[in-house]
């Protein structure tokens, strides 16, 4: 069976197979029931109020002393723990405290007997150290260590301490009055000097403050310049890094685009090659065959057109020669006719002229009445006497024709009525 204990306690296991007994301070231990037994001892710190009433000092003056001591069983030291177990195992904390208290009180009384009241009263530290030293060397053999010892109180029933203090008090009061007067004197001197030093110190302080402010402003300006410079450098470096990063990204993007474009070009080239092959198979070969056929047809049509052009040229040439011959024959016939007319005019003179005039007279009448044929509407205005309507138009035309011989005579000097009067009658 396992048993445990805290750091303020120690366990001692004895019995079967436990020789010497096992001591465990703050831990656990295995115990065989019935054949082994376990005991515990406290390691708590004990506070002891050590009182020594009416102890005679070296000069025979009885006084009472009260001290405060802190003691405990030392569990970390195996030898001291073994000694404590031998001395106090099975005892309560109160019993252990009583034993330690009696031991300390005895040593305290012994130290008091070897010292005077003045030594104990004036040098408490020396008294405490002697009690601590003597008691520790004795209690350590019991496994107890003295943690601390302090002198708490000193008093007596004979007013020895009070009487001892009166002379000292009177001397102290005298010294106090003298010291007070000297202090006031020195205080006045020191006060004046202090005021002077204060003014000087204040001036120096203001000067130092001004210098410090100046140095602060200068250093602050320097630091601000450096900080702004570093910040500007950092911003510039950041911008440069951003620009470099953007440039790298752009270069990578361009490289990717170049690769993609190269891949696209390769794909397009493959597609072009495939289409060229397809075009070669589907279009070019049939087109070349068709071109060859069309070239043959064009050459045949060209030859045919050349032959047709040559035939047309020959036909035009022959037609031109025929027309030229016809024109020449017509001209010769007209010339002969004109010659014959000239002979007839020579022979008949005025009769021939009259015949020619009469031959052209219908044309003259046609030209005179031509404007009337192109008129869309004719409006006649009459005063109420004479003919009306179409008879009026006919009369007007006949009136114009009746005046024609006069016009011919004025233009040519030939009188149609006279020539007609002198013309001999034709016989059948």
UniProtKB/Swiss-Prot annotation:
Topology of the protein relative to the lipid bilayer: Peripheral membrane protein
GO molecular function, a single term: protease binding
Keywords: Cell membrane, Endosome, Membrane, Phosphoprotein
Pfam name, any one: Band_7
Phosphoserine: residues carrying this PTM: 19, 163, 385
Additional notes on this entry: Expression increases at least 10-fold as 3T3-L1 cells differentiate into adipocytes.
Function, as annotated: May act as a scaffolding protein within caveolar membranes, functionally participating in formation of caveolae or caveolae-like vesicles.
PANTHER family for this protein: FLOTILLIN-1-RELATED, FLOTILLIN-RELATED
Family to which this protein belongs: Belongs to the band 7/mec-2 family. Flotillin subfamily.
Protein name: Flotillin-1
